[in-house]
Amino acid sequence: MEEPEEQPPHEADTEPVVTSGASEAVPRVLPGDPQNLSDVDAFNLLLEMKLKRRRERPNLPHTVTELVAEDGSRVYVVGTAHFSDDSKRDVVKTIREVQPDVVVVELCQYRVSMLKMDERTLLREAKEISLEKLQQAIRQNGVASGLMQMLLLKVSAHITEQLGVAPGGEFREAFKEASRVPFCKFHLGDRPIPVTFKRAIAALSLWQKVKLAWGLCFLSDPISKDDVERCKQKDLLEQMMAEMVGEFPDLHRTIVSERDVYLTYMLRQAARRLELPRASDAEPRKCVPSVVVGVVGMGHVPGIEKNWTTDLNIQEIMTVPPPSASGRVSRLAVKAAALGLLGYGLYWTGRRAVSLLLALPAARHCLQRLSDAWPQK
């Protein structure tokens, strides 16, 4: 029986503004003393300022894809390369042009800490793969998934070391820009890491796990900034994904395709009509379409476009399948091998230590005295 994973909150604890705004219907500015404005009038005044900044026909980067919801809400998806300076500029320009009501980023609550770190601290953290990080990954995801997460972190550390650029700069820029937009909310739109890694590990055979781990362990190819910027081209990304599908199709499904569905669902949830405040209950309710900016890796953009108008059921991709019989056997074999290696290592170390100890003159002298003192039969 599959056990459903608990779904964490999707809205960041560090939300810039907790009040939602609107995207149309510029209200009239009311005259009078600002100190005597009601809450509704103050809201309308700030909303008008926001809408004046919002461009009707925004000049957007070529990495932005525009999607329209059934109710007229608009979603601007910024496709990014996670180590790219150009992507950071694309995110800033898009948010300033459209003045969104919601910003959704490709992060979950387990990675939200990167929004609070400065560039230097994050660069140092990204380069370090410590025992503490390994223990934390294993506690969160289990042994196999935790080890796989550390291998992927090793890949990220390799890129960080090659480029000297910390990952996730576009998300930090999105967070800062969202805090400058009136009534803009900040949402975490990615599936929780533990769910993704557990489903990925469950989808791979033992041989595929070994093959993938081997490839990640010995990754050492040099990477240039030009390589990262070329990742913003859809044709190159599709070629890379096609190669990945051929070798690890189940891994591509769990890490890319399923997250495409999840990100699409979260963007659609954010793109809902917004209700304007009323001066009194007697006034009729008025709702307007919203404007949303999504910040995701370029590799997810085709999947989001594909899933935008389809019916989505994220419960199917939020469950972790139970381990198979072969999976349980392989885990026991790995644990037995690890214990065997540990036992042999302790035996060899102890034997070597005893040999070195007995080779000392003082130890030989003590043994000789004990032998002389022992009663002979």
Swiss-Prot record:
Q: What is the lineage of its organism?
A: Eukaryota, Metazoa, Chordata, Craniata, Vertebrata
Pfam families in the record, alphabetically? TraB_PrgY_gumN
Segments of this protein annotated with the region Disordered? 1-34
Q: Which CDD domains match?
A: TraB_PrgY-like (cd14726)
Chain positions with Phosphothreonine modification: 65
Gene name, please? TRABD
The protein's name in its UniProt record: TraB domain-containing protein
Assigned keywords, A-Z: Acetylation, Phosphoprotein
Q: Which residues carry this modification: N-acetylmethionine?
A: 1
